[in-house]
Amino acid sequence: FGNPPYSRASQHEGQYITGMRYIMKHASSMRDKGGRYVFLIKAATSEVWWPEDADHIAFIRGRIGFELPAWFIPKDEKQVPTGAFFAGAIAVFDKTWKGPAISYIGRDELEACGEAFLAQVRQQAEKLVREMAA
């Protein structure tokens, strides 16, 4: 799962590590090899990086807010967290996908799904800790 950076494309040791065009291109090529990727992206269908070849796109109804970690102290008012200023979408790269190519999901439903998933992860983590302590 990822929320890719929208920064300009840059390389490290000859490999692109940022830039949506390259991130989406890499996800697509890894999908062809069996990789499964889910990205929270800007719903910007006119951008050159828009993932036309994604197996599923879910457009999000409602803006998504971003919460910073409790330890983060904004340097100035430019770093104060706000909601996204653009519409969002979820791009799925998974060649085993059997659902529709396009769908819509409300922000509240998406957040509820995320909370349910996190509850399952926490439950399994607690179980693992107990087993390791025994």
Predicted feature descriptions by range:
Residues 1-134:
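Class I S-adenosyl-L-methionine-dependent methyltransferase catalytic core
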